[in-house]
Curated annotation (Swiss-Prot):
UniProt protein name: Translation initiation factor IF-1
Family membership noted in the UniProt record: Belongs to the IF-1 family.
Function field: One of the essential components for the initiation of protein synthesis. Stabilizes the binding of IF-2 and IF-3 on the 30S subunit to which N-formylmethionyl-tRNA(fMet) subsequently binds. Helps modulate mRNA selection, yielding the 30S pre-initiation complex (PIC). Upon addition of the 50S ribosomal subunit IF-1, IF-2 and IF-3 are released leaving the mature 70S translation initiation complex.
Lineage of producing organism: Bacteria, Pseudomonadati, Pseudomonadota, Betaproteobacteria, Neisseriales
GO terms for MF: ribosome binding; rRNA binding; translation initiation factor activity
Gene3D superfamilies registered for this protein in UniProt: Nucleic acid-binding proteins (2.40.50.140)
Length: 72
């Protein structure tokens, strides 16, 4: 899958789930399941409920997302 195929959106973490998975409320009020990208995991970036994040969605499954950035 090429990087150009992803859809980037802003969202907010609602709750933490097991295995580094989170419920994310997108700016268009949809709720998706998001997991941390590998680079965020590698650099021990912590995410907690209420954080603003940027997620990448694929056009194939719009219910799952990859968290790629946490806003300060």
């Amino acid at each position: 899958m090429a990087k150009e195929d992803t859809i980037q959106m802003q969202g907010e973490i609602l709750e933490t789930l097991p295995n580094a998975t989170f419920k994310v409320k997108l700016e268009n009020d949809h709720i998706v399941l998001g997991h941390i990208s590998g680079k965020m995991r590698m650099h021990y970036i912590r995410i907690s409920p209420g954080d603003k994040v940027t997620v990448e969605l694929t056009p194939y499954d719009l219910t799952r997302a990859r968290i790629v950035f946490r806003a300060r």
